[in-house]
């Protein structure tokens, strides 16, 4: 496993807080089946997301409004699921 630091990524996303948000969003996308832009060598999605940012493949654009709509769609629960839990 490659060891990554904030310094490896800060050249591409210069705000540490935005870096964390972008990495978390990209890690969720990877966990949901998004195609990685770097080789995936048995690493966790968070490590792959940070490697993508460090190599300049991913930036804060990953947090656009379209992805917010995707997240809202993914989080919707059907009436059938509600009945099953009752």
Curated annotation (Swiss-Prot):
InterPro entries: DNA-dir_RNA_pol_omega, Pol_omega/Rpo6/RPB6, RPB6/omega-like_sf. Residues 67-86 are annotated as: Disordered. It comes from the Bacteria. Coiled coil: none annotated. Residues 77-86 have a biased composition (Acidic residues). NCBIfam families: rpoZ. Promotes RNA polymerase assembly. Latches the N- and C-terminal regions of the beta' subunit thereby facilitating its interaction with the beta and alpha subunits. This is DNA-directed RNA polymerase subunit omega. It comes from Nitrosococcus oceani (strain ATCC 19707 / BCRC 17464 / JCM 30415 / NCIMB 11848 / C-107). The lineage of its organism: Bacteria, Pseudomonadati, Pseudomonadota, Gammaproteobacteria, Chromatiales.
């Amino acid at each position: 496993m490659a060891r990554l630091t904030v310094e490896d990524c800060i050249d591409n996303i210069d705000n540490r807080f935005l870096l964390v948000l972008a990495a978390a969003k990209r890690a969720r996308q990877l966990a949901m089946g998004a195609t990685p832009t770097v080789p995936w060598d048995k690493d966790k999605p968070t490590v792959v997301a940070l490697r993508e940012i460090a190599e300049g493949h991913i930036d804060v654009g990953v947090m656009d409004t379209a992805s917010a709509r995707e997240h809202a769609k993914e989080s919707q629960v059907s009436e059938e699921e509600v009945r099953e839990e009752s």
